[in-house]
């Protein structure tokens, strides 16, 4: 399945956002309650007489994992992660050169400290719920991967998948480096991504050859491979030719996805990031799932391929090429890796489809009143994480608990709560089928990042009332009942 071109305008035109001027005790500020970090302290804007001024401030922790909440969640997410692995710093600096563009990327996994619920609220027993099969909406059309299907079940779950890197050295540049040295930080993030999202164990593997494989052609010999685009005959021939060159040197046994890279010194304008595949035959069998990656080239200014070098969009494209996830369009705001623009981890439903979650972590809700305790989606835990309401054979409502941490460590505290959204598998448009459900308050926030329901908030959707009745570091307790 193809990642359509509308993604380019959303990811390559990275926004810039205003931030508060550096705070100083007694200096004027603009709005009561806002906070700002300066010189190792967190200052809060307070009312003093008829004026608004910054208070004396409180010393902040040295760890940037404990970010300070901002007025605009998107401004908060734009902050540069100074604790990112050092190998990503050239990309971070490259991004800053573009008018100090917003860096929405996550670069690492930050463990979430889950606590055990110690309250007295009784939740609905699993035996009183529907079977998980009742909530597994079936995909029967050619649209994006929103539901279960034979195509989905035939794919190896991410937690058990094997990805083969095919590093080629074209006549455009002769490298003295190695693929692992040049791209190891990306593959380490990829392995961390799968391992930490797989609550039930992982044997995921990225296979990286020791050196680049000689491919005696130039990228310029192939038309229409230079940008993010739809499949082309020239691009498919490129895949066939490079595999023919690599086949004598690589054992493709058990492979699920082929990742093509070239030395980062190659001009990024010669090769676009593309998730579409080509049927190729090797000594070990036939394969057709490919992900071609733009060179990590930071020397040629900002071009049409530049936005695809960052970790978030690389992972986004990977989930196009493997599991055929579509773009969730703007129906989710910034929620979900497959949304546009994506600023968070995968949605819980996507994780379930991809095999990161098991059936035991899903609560399929009946029409009768139910109460569920949901463990935060960022916690490394086999606890129940999704509550799903089956509306009909093609539509469900999904409920999950959101906290700061994991790969969502750049979210502000104001984004914590209960995320509610609708899945409609009747949609065949690659950019539709997933829709956020929230209050007027939540939908009015930047990128809808304030959409999660807070304590005592309620929404009504498709005849069901969804309420948050308790919350904490254990997650959220949610009450669901039919209204009609």
Feature-to-residue mapping (PLM):
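Zn2+-dependent metallopeptidase catalytic core
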Residues: 71-311, 315, 467-470
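Acidic glycine-/aspartate-rich tracts in secreted/extracellular proteins
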Residues: 49-51, 170-173, 265-267, 343, ...
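Extracellular disulfide-bonded cysteine-rich modules/repeats
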Residues: 39-47
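Secreted, propeptide-processed cysteine-rich mini-domains
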Residues: 21-35, 69, 76
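Extracellular hydrolytic enzyme modules, especially secreted metalloproteases
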Residues: 257, 265-410
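C-terminal segment of classical bacterial N-terminal signal peptides
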Residues: 11-19
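Sec-dependent N-terminal signal peptides
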Residues: 1-8
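Non-catalytic C-terminal accessory/binding modules of secreted extracellular proteins
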Residues: 80-83, 144, 283-304, 369-484
């Amino acid at each position: 399945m193809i990642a359509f071109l509308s993604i380019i305008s959303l990811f390559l035109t990275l926004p810039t956002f205003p931030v508060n001027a550096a705070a100083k005790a007694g200096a004027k500020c603009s709005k009561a309650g806002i906070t700002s970090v300066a010189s190792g302290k967190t200052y809060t804007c307070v009312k003093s007489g008829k004026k608004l001024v910054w208070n004396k401030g409180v010393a902040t922790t040295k760890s940037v994992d404990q970010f300070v909440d901002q007025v605009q969640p998107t401004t908060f997410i734009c902050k540069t992660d100074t604790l990112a692995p050092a190998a990503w710093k050239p990309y971070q600096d490259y991004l800053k050169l573009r008018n100090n563009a917003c860096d929405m990327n996550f670069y690492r996994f930050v463990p979430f400290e889950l606590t055990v619920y110690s309250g007295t609220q009784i939740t609905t027993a699993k035996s009183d719920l529907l079977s998980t099969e009742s909530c597994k909406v079936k995909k029967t059309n050619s649209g994006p991967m929103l539901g279960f299907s034979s195509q989905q079940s035939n794919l190896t779950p991410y937690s058990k998948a094997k990805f083969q890197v095919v590093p080629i050295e074209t006549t455009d540049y002769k490298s003295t480096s190695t693929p692992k040295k040049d791209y190891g930080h990306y593959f380490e993030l990829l392995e961390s991504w799968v391992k930490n999202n797989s609550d039930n164990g992982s044997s995921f593997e990225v296979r990286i050859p020791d050196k680049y494989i000689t491919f005696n052609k130039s990228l310029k010999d192939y038309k229409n491979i230079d940008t993010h685009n739809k499949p082309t005959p020239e691009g498919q021939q490129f895949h066939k030719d490079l595999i023919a060159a690599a086949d004598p040197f690589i054992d493709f046994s058990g492979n699920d996805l082929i990742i093509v890279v070239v030395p980062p010194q190659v001009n990024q304008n010669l090769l676009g990031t593309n998730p579409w595949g080509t049927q190729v035959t090797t000594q070990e069998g036939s394969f057709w799932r490919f992900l071609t990656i733009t060179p990590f080239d930071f020397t040629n200014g900002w071009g049409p391929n530049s936005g695809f070098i960052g970790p978030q969009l690389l992972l986004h494209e990977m989930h196009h090429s493997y599991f055929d996830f579509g773009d969730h369009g703007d129906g989710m705001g910034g929620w979900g890796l497959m949304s546009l623009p994506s600023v968070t981890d995968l949605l819980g439903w996507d994780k379930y489809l991809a095999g990161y979650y098991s059936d035991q972590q899903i609560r399929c809700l009946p029409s009768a009143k139910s109460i569920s305790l949901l463990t935060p989606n960022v916690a490394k835990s086999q606890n129940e994480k999704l509550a799903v309401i089956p509306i009909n054979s093609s539509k469900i409502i999904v409920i999950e608990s959101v906290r700061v941490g994991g790969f969502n460590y750049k979210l502000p505290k104001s984004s914590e709560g209960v995320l509610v959204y609708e899945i409609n598998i009747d949609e065949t448009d690659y950019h539709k089928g997933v829709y956020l459900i929230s209050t007027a308050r939540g939908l009015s926030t930047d990128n809808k990042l304030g959409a999660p329901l807070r304590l005592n908030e309620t929404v009504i959707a498709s005849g069901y009332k969804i309420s948050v009745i308790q919350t904490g570091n254990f997650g959220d307790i949610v009450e669901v009942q039919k209204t009609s």
